[in-house]
Amino acid sequence: MLRSHCMEFSEELKTLKDQVRFDGSFRTGTFSNIVIAGMGGSGIAGRIFSEMYSAKPVFVCDDYHIPEFVDGNTEFIAVSYSGNTEETLSAAEEAIKKGAKVHAITSGGRLSEMGVDTIKIPGGLQPRSAVGYLTMPIINTFIRPKHEDIEEAAGLLSDLDKNNTVQENIATEIYAGRRIPVIYGSTPYRSVAYRWKTQFNENAKILAYSNYFSELNHNDTMPLRDTYRKDEFYFMAFDSTDERIRKRIEVTQKITGTSFKKIEARGSSLIARIFYLIHFGDYVTYHLARIRNVDPQDVSAIEDLKKRIS
């Protein structure tokens, strides 16, 4: 059951800590850029990392092909939980041909047989339920967070495991109005807003939309004021420590006549706040799936698509 996988998230963080990383020193001067390839639940790892790391350029590749700049100075990380993701395998093969330093995070499959530096993670999960296993090796390798920051994150996640009534109430409100979730983030939580969107898609089996401040003020502002059937959407916005973003959130609500459900990140460290928000969204979507009486782990349509195009 997905709930049990949710509750394993904090244990993933405690288990992985900073001892799980790729081989090599990865000193800043030894590479020019980082490319992280991954799709779906595996692809979120690169998106999360890209908002936490800025010492070198980070490119998230969710395609068959890699960017032209990839060369021998590129640290290329292929992330595929199954090890058989078509797009990621194609990208990894191209990276090898271009002489990049290629690494992999996977539970097995063809990716584990490519002969590259590989971190093997436990199997038997849905990729989206293995976000800790998929993300922490990258964070540990390039950022090396403090032990106490990871412990803080694990503790906050454990608290959510014990009490997720707030998340259940949000799910109930969404279901009661048969509303479409809209999730607004801002740096460094843009990828988390996208993660929420995909969790609503896969877990609760409903459409959802995500965007981020302040970019959304250059496009979403007009429809927020003038669109039809606005009452069919459920708007949520992550709070920000940036006063300019906070002001934008408040002014956007006032001039468009829209109310946002404010979601506040907890934790003193960035890694704690990011993983807290991820876990928060996981529970909202789990509860919505339960209320809708749908199996949150069912991905039969996705598997059918893969079979038909293979």
From Swiss-Prot:
Pfam family, any one: bact-PGI_C
EC number from the UniProt entry: 5.3.1.8, 5.3.1.9
Binding site for D-fructose 6-phosphate: 41-42, 80, 82, 85, 128, 218, 306
GO biological process, one term: carbohydrate derivative metabolic process
Domain named SIS: residues: 22-152
Notes on activation and inhibition: Inhibited by low concentrations of erythrose 4-phosphate and 6-phosphogluconate.
UniProt cross-references to InterPro entries, sorted A to Z: Glu6P/Mann6P_isomerase_C, SIS_dom, SIS_dom_sf, SIS_PGI/PMI_1
PROSITE patterns: SIS
Comment on activity versus temperature: Optimum temperature is 75 degrees Celsius.
Subunit and interaction comment: Homodimer.
pH dependence of function: Optimum pH is 7.6.
Active site: 202, 218, 306
Reported function: Dual specificity isomerase that catalyzes the isomerization of both glucose-6-phosphate and mannose-6-phosphate to fructose-6-phosphate with similar catalytic efficiency.
Superkingdom of origin organism: Archaea
Listed Gene3D superfamilies: Glucose-6-phosphate isomerase like protein, domain 1
UniProt catalytic activity: alpha-D-glucose 6-phosphate = beta-D-fructose 6-phosphate; D-mannose 6-phosphate = D-fructose 6-phosphate
Annotated source species: Thermoplasma acidophilum (strain ATCC 25905 / DSM 1728 / JCM 9062 / NBRC 15155 / AMRC-C165)
Similarity comment: family membership: Belongs to the PGI/PMI family.
Protein name: Bifunctional phosphoglucose/phosphomannose isomerase
Top EC class of this enzyme: isomerase
Keyword Isomerase: yes
Any GO MF annotation of the entry: glucose-6-phosphate isomerase activity
